Amino acid sequence: MAVVLRLSRAGTHKAPFYHVVATDSRNARDGKYLEDVGIYDPTKRPERIELKVERIEHWLKAGAKPSQTVAMILKRAAKAAAPVAPKA
């Protein structure tokens, strides 16, 4: 079983939001998943990104591969959470 981290679409017509899920790569986009590990809402300004970092790290260590979009979301979240160094 190849586990991937990818987006599962939810919401209404023209108002989507996405769940970040760990699932078998053979499952449908909105089908059965192993675990819900976050939420991504691109319609909010600024974008709403809520991730369960510990669970994402668990799945990555277990061999799960993130989709291109999830990898981009993880980079954005890491950049937003990084401490800013004060200017001297």
UniProtKB/Swiss-Prot annotation:
Keyword Transport: no
Gene Ontology MF term list: structural constituent of ribosome
InterPro entries xref list: Ribosomal_bS16, Ribosomal_bS16_dom_sf
UniProt superkingdom: Bacteria
UniProt keyword annotation of Cell membrane present: no
GO BP terms in the entry: translation
PANTHER family: 30S RIBOSOMAL PROTEIN S16, SMALL RIBOSOMAL SUBUNIT PROTEIN BS16M
Family, similarity comment: Belongs to the bacterial ribosomal protein bS16 family.
Record protein name field: Small ribosomal subunit protein bS16
Species this chain originates from: Anaeromyxobacter sp. (strain K)
Upper taxonomic lineage: Bacteria, Pseudomonadati, Myxococcota, Myxococcia, Myxococcales
